[in-house]
Amino acid sequence: MAEAARHPDDMKTPDELYRYLVDRVAGMESQNQELKEQIRQLESDKRYIETQKIRYEREVRKLKSEIEHLKTPPLIVGTITDIIDSGRVVVRSSAGPRFLVRVSQAVNPTTLKAGVRCTLNQQSLAIVEVLPSTYDSQVYGMELVDAPTETYEDIGGLEKQIMEIREAVELPMTRPDLFEKIGINPPKGVLLYGPPGTGKTLLAKAVAHETHAIFLHTVGSELVQKYIGEGARLVRELFDLAKEKAPSIVFIDEIDAIGASRTEAMTSGDREVQRTLMQLLAAMDGFEPRGDVKIIGATNRIDILDAALLRPGRFDRIIEIPLPDTEGRYSILKVHTRCMNLSEDVDLMEVARLTEGRNGAELNAICMEAGMFAIRKEHPQVDQEDFLTALNKFRCDFERDHRLTTAGVMFA
């Protein structure tokens, strides 16, 4: 190092000067390399800092935008009642009065329709946004998430009724060209009536399964609400949802809860039921006969239904679901026992003859009780004796026709 620090003038020989210069060049190259590494490190730090700066600037803009949104005054919710032209519409605000307002350029003119909800600016009442349609939570609850799995093979003894309901509901949805070729309008709705437990609901679910349609199931009593207009609104939203989800089937079970004959109402509750019925009649009149929405009603009391509900144009086809005869009961027993492990001595025809006046639900209960007796005896199969024992218990312990109970009653 001492030699390298000497001045070039002190060098006495060319060799010493050469070594001195070589050492100086090597030192300068090493120093140059270190400076290059420092420059690369500084450039890398600069790029990182610039990236962080861009990220923080973006975050600042996002927070400023959120603050501006929070400072924005709330909008008024209104309903479009009439469309004057693409830039002006008549709206009814949530407070009640109507206004002729302008439409923001950000709103798509094709979304402007009468009855659609929208948001209005507080100052100018201009339409800022068109809101999506919404329905009551009860209406959404009427839609079955899982499609019905029941098929026509699960129904026994109703071959004629199956044919009639397929003609009235299934064919218009799957083969509308047949009706167009003949030149007739298919039935708008089908009413199923008959004693309890004869398979009315099962038949409606089977139709929905075969047509691959959305199944909207409700009970008439669910449409009866406490406050004025609530029941009519539920009916209106139910049929609007059915049109939106088309092809769909609206099934109203126990329709006599809202469809009873109108009389001089003595209470506000009776008047509200009549308002709901009138909304139902208006909704049924609004359907296209060849549309993808069908309505099926079911009742045990057709004798008390209002005549306006039964007239052609609403429930065009009225199908009776009677108590099964011997052949029908035999078919029902075959359906209920197809998954049971039966012994060879089981005679379902004899069981069918012994169950005169029983409906499908009661026959299912008899099959279940026969299986329970086999389990009690720890038998691997259900024999004829189990069926006869179940039939005797069903007949003796619970007299359904007279509603009499005795000790050891069986509730099937």
Swiss-Prot record:
Instruction: Using the UniProt record, give the first listed, main subcellular location.
Output: cytoplasm
GO biological-process terms attached to the record:
proteasomal protein catabolic process; protein unfolding
Renumbered to this chain, region (Docks into pockets in the proteasome alpha-ring to cause gate opening) spans: 410-412
Q: Which superkingdom heads the taxonomic lineage of this protein's source?
A: Archaea
Q: Which GO terms describe its cellular component?
A: cytoplasm; proteasome-activating nucleotidase complex
**Which of this chain's residues are annotated to bind ATP?**
G197, T198, G199, K200, T201, L202, H336
Q: Name one GO molecular function term.
A: ATP hydrolysis activity
Localization, per the record, is: Cytoplasm
Keyword set for this entry? ATP-binding, Chaperone, Coiled coil, Cytoplasm, Nucleotide-binding, Proteasome
Read off the Pfam families from this record: AAA (PF00004), AAA_lid_3 (PF17862), Prot_ATP_ID_OB_C (PF16450)
Chaperone recorded as keyword: yes
Q: Coiled-coil segments, which residues?
A: 18-72
Keyword RNA-binding annotated: no
| Family statement | Belongs to the AAA ATPase family.
Q: What does this protein do?
A: ATPase which is responsible for recognizing, binding, unfolding and translocation of substrate proteins into the archaeal 20S proteasome core particle. Is essential for opening the gate of the 20S proteasome via an interaction with its C-terminus, thereby allowing substrate entry and access to the site of proteolysis. Thus, the C-termini of the proteasomal ATPase function like a 'key in a lock' to induce gate opening and therefore regulate proteolysis.
The free-text domain remark for this protein reads: Consists of three main regions, an N-terminal coiled-coil domain that may assist in substrate recognition, an interdomain involved in PAN hexamerization, and a C-terminal ATPase domain of the AAA type.
Task: Describe the protein's quaternary organization and the partners it interacts with.
Answer: Homohexamer. The hexameric complex has a two-ring architecture resembling a top hat that caps the 20S proteasome core at one or both ends. Upon ATP-binding, the C-terminus of PAN interacts with the alpha-rings of the proteasome core by binding to the intersubunit pockets.
Name of the protein in question: Proteasome-activating nucleotidase
Taxonomic source organism: Methanospirillum hungatei JF-1 (strain ATCC 27890 / DSM 864 / NBRC 100397 / JF-1)
